[in-house]
Amino acid sequence: MGKIIGIDLGTTNSCVYVMEGKEPKCITNPNGGRTTPSVVAFTDKDRLVGDAAKRQAITNSARTIFAVKRLMGRRADSPEVVHWKEHAPYKIVAASNGDAAVEIDGREYSPQEISAIILSKLKADAEAYLGESVSEAVITVPAYFNDAQRQATKDAGRIAGLDVKRIINEPTAASLAYGFDKKANEKIAVFDLGGGTFDVSILEVGDSVVEVLATNGDTFLGGEDFDQRIINYLVEEFKKEQGIDLSKDNMALQRLKDSAENAKKELSTAMETEINLPFITADQSGPKHLLIKLTRAKLEQLVMDLVGRTIEPCSKALEDAGLQTSNIDEVILVGGMTRMPLVQKKVAEFFGKEPNRSVNPDEVVAMGAAIQGGILAGDVKDVLLLDVTPLSLGIETMGGVFTKLIDRNTTIPTRKSQTFTTAADNQPSVSIHVLQGERPMASDNMTLARFDLTGIPPAPRGVPQIEVAFNIDANGIVNVSAKDLGTGKEQSIQITASSGLSEADIEKLIREAESHASEDKKKQEIIEVRNHADGLIYSTEKSIKDLEGKIDAELQADITSKIEALKKVMEGEDSAAIKKATDELASASHKLAEQLYKQTQETSGASGDPTDTSASSSKSGDDVVDADFTEVK
């Protein structure tokens, strides 16, 4: 059985992913691009697709088809198609069945045919990448697509020689790729504003289940409309300056379209841009040049109502889901238009929180489609059932540190244990906080379970021995137990869903861990030096108390002052200062030990033969063993 590829058949650009092992991989086109323009062009000798078609659009606008997704499954007399006819440089006609079609050189092409040409290109790129034939695919569609549009998409796949195993909604695909790596049972909103369509879906994710609660959208709202507003503005400004209407000149319009798209992208990061198109047209007086500055503020003014149109579907989707904005845990941005600052601002204002920008808005849908393909092929299952544990497992220890017991990618079944102790005197119980993840701090990882081991007999801190054991069987089921080695008392818990993560989510956590490596290292270092300092203070104070009356008063005063100095510096965040104060206290503590041993030796020397003392010392040192050994190689 061959690979099932995942395809995001977009209005402006398309993308294809495939599962390689347990990881989704982007299939680049021959030009190295991770996305391919959804453009088809017909020339006198050839048919061009993707970048090649887009490059020649200016000189061949009437035979260059873009945004054909807007025509999929639509009637020629529908308001959307009528509106698009006014702006498209290519000819849109009614087919014999009343559906919208395009006419090139007297021949009709259905939107399905044009889409199939794009799909064929993606299929060929995938075959070149994989080195094997590809016949099966998962193709995404806007969640708000109707049945006719879905069927048209499936037909396009069939025309391209693909067995479409599943038509999957774009927000659902995005959810699969995004994953749910922070909390179980999250409610998320996927805000998907692409080149031609807008979707918003409210989903509940967790326990390896993605459930769509409600969806809404506008299948004729996207980046193409934003571009058109800029084109209209440039046409008007040029007409004011030169008295020439560029809207009747297809070649000029195509140049304006390219410039409008680039300007829109630039204004996502810059505050203003310059559109410079020399020789845009000519009249009797000679050639004319277009030079217009466009600011971000002006762009936002031009498209404010378009952005506003995204809010009502969000309200409706929430209402249908029976939720308030406060119930949404994460807002995921999908689609290239979500890079626009105004869009991000409106999303944040509506949902009351900053959107999550952890996914690549251009690729996340195709990635999710590939994961769905892996599920259908049986290559992707609940990660708990796989033969390795995908993320490290461990518990929270003193100072909020995540202590790993089983590292990620450990082959299962496996069992690992480690002995811990109490952090306070007479501690009657310990709380076991079971975690999964790769970050050094417990709070940054995923909680799997919490349970308590009670009934620990009163004892000084550091004395009780608590063995914590993780046991993962071949089914991926995790058992965690905690046992007091002194009393034999044991408590255990079975975790049947230790991971609801896809491989993409695991990779995301690892990348996140790497990006936060420096910050995590500092946090961990300060915790470790504090713990070391705290332990030294405890043991030193205990020694002073136990040896009361036997220590030189001057030395005791020196040690006490150093203890207070260390406690004071521990209130800050300077690990170097804490280390220095700890070393100073340790040095003073060594003097305490030297004095103690000196007193002991003097006492022993006064009471008997030194050789007897030595022999006695050897006998009493049960834990000191002198032994011969042979190294076995």
From Swiss-Prot:
Q: Which domain of life is it from?
A: Bacteria
Region span, Disordered? 592-633
Question: Is the keyword ATP-binding assigned to this protein?
Answer: yes
Keyword field: ATP-binding, Chaperone, Nucleotide-binding, Phosphoprotein, Stress response
Locate the compositionally biased regions of type Acidic residues: 623-633
Q: What induces it?
A: By stress conditions e.g. heat shock.
Q: In the record, which positions carry Phosphothreonine?
A: 197
- Composition bias (Polar residues) maps to 597-619
Record has GTP-binding as a keyword: no
**A Gene Ontology MF term for this entry?**
unfolded protein binding
Which PANTHER family is this protein grouped with? HEAT SHOCK PROTEIN 70KDA
Q: Give a short account of what the protein does.
A: Acts as a chaperone.
Family per similarity comment: Belongs to the heat shock protein 70 family.
Task: Specify the protein name.
Answer: Chaperone protein DnaK
What organism does the UniProt record list as the source? Lawsonia intracellularis (strain PHE/MN1-00)
